[in-house]
A protein has these predicted regions:
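Acyl-donor-binding surface of acyltransferase catalytic domains
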Residues: 1-10, 80-88, 94-165, 304
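Short amphipathic alpha-helix that is part of the acyltransferase structural core
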Residues: 1-51, 159-194
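Active-site/acyl-donor-binding loops of N-acyltransferases
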Residues: 2, 136-155, 261, 268-308
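Conserved donor-binding loop and adjoining core beta-sheet/short helix segment
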Residues: 18-19, 23-26, 33-114, 119, ...
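Hydrophobic beta-strand residues of extracellular immunoglobulin-like
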Residues: 62-65, 214-217, 261
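A structural microfeature
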Residues: 74, 141-143, 226, 256, ...
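Conserved acetyl-CoA-binding loop-helix of GNAT-fold acetyltransferases
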Residues: 99-113, 243-248, 252-269, 287-292
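Phosphate-binding active sites in nucleotide-utilizing proteins
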Residues: 187-233, 248
Length: 308
């Protein structure tokens, strides 16, 4: 959520809500996101949201295009796929068109579309986004930390795996179903991750950054019990602990820490200077583990919601 909500006179605006975007509309939205990221230093829409721009209609996802004078100046995405929580949204206004109330207009449209049950991300926690959340009557609900640590001095030894556990890399097509099942079980409490489908996995496998050599699977016999999927952000020189999960039956035995170390050793071996990861601030156990591994908080994403 990125917007300066100070209202100044501007060109007449309109908001169109669509179930899917055309190729031309997708490119226009991506251009808007890039312009905003250059100004804000961070993407206003998550990786999942950007993937959902392409590929036609997706269940529970809608796109709001705000135009002024025929020009696209704002975008919002609303996802209503969580069976428990309110719909989640992300929004952005072009840096050159802020201060005209476009953010408030998009926020009001999202509230109307969601039946006034809404969660909104503010990536980076910018002050303008916090102000807009207040104007819309939203309260802080969740804090997602991005943590980082240098890899230049990472010299952890090869980890000792729990008895009977072996690790190999992901084989696309062969391991998809098993990974989706363990991912769902490991993140049953975290619908954003645990609800990933084959289509979501295929989207990621089609991305230029996907590399199965950095996708580690832990097995006990023939049973997949955990994984560490790493991601390289080549332009930024960052290696990410992209997704780390351990099946419920294998938790508590040190497998998560071992998989973390395996992934970090891999990223360090790529010559990447820095590792990063995302973790919920209220997951005290995970934050403590990562802090012991040398990670510190780099920035935060904030989620706001309507009162329930």
């Amino acid at each position: 959520m990125t917007s300066d909500d100070t209202v100044r006179p501007g060109r007449p605006r309109s908001i169109e809500t669509l179930a899917a975007l055309s190729a031309e509309q997708t490119e226009a939205v991506l251009g808007l996101l890039d312009e905003a990221a250059r100004t804000d230093g961070q993407q206003a829409v998550s990786e999942q949201g950007r993937l959902q721009l392409r590929g036609g209609e997706r269940e529970g996802v809608s796109h709001l295009l705000l135009t002024a004078g025929g020009e696209l100046v704002g975008y919002a995405q609303l996802e209503d796929t969580d069976l428990v929580e309110p719909p989640a949204a992300e929004l952005v206004v072009h840096p050159g068109h802020r201060g005209h109330g476009h953010g408030r207009a998009l926020g009001s449209a999202l509230l109307a579309a969601s039946g006034k049950r809404l969660r909104v991300w503010a990536h980076g926690g910018h002050s303008a986004a916090r102000h807009l959340a207040q104007v819309l009557g939203l309260t802080l609900f969740r804090e997602l930390r991005q943590m980082r640590r240098p890899l230049t001095d990472f010299d952890a030894p090869e980890p000792v795996l729990p008895e009977g556990v072996t690790v190999r890399t992901f084989v696309p097509g062969e391991d998809d179903a098993a990974w989706l099942a363990v991912n769902a079980a490991a993140f049953a409490h975290h619908p954003e991750q645990g609800s990933l489908t084959q289509r979501d996995l295929d989207d990621r496998k089609a991305e230029p950054w996907f590399d199965p050599a950095g996708f580690f699977l832990a097995f006990r016999g023939d049973e997949l019990v955990g994984f560490h999927w790493t991601k390289v952000h080549a332009e930024e020189g960052l290696g990410e602990v992209y997704v780390l999960g351990v099946g419920p039956g294998a938790q508590g035995g040190g497998l998560g820490k071992s998989l973390t170390t395996i992934g970090l050793r891999h990223l360090a071996g790529q010559g990447l200077p820095t590792a990063m990861l995302y973790v919920d601030a209220d997951n005290k156990a995970a934050v403590s583990v990562y802090e012991r591994l040398g990670f510190t908080t780099h920035e935060v994403d904030l989620m706001y919601r309507t009162e329930t």
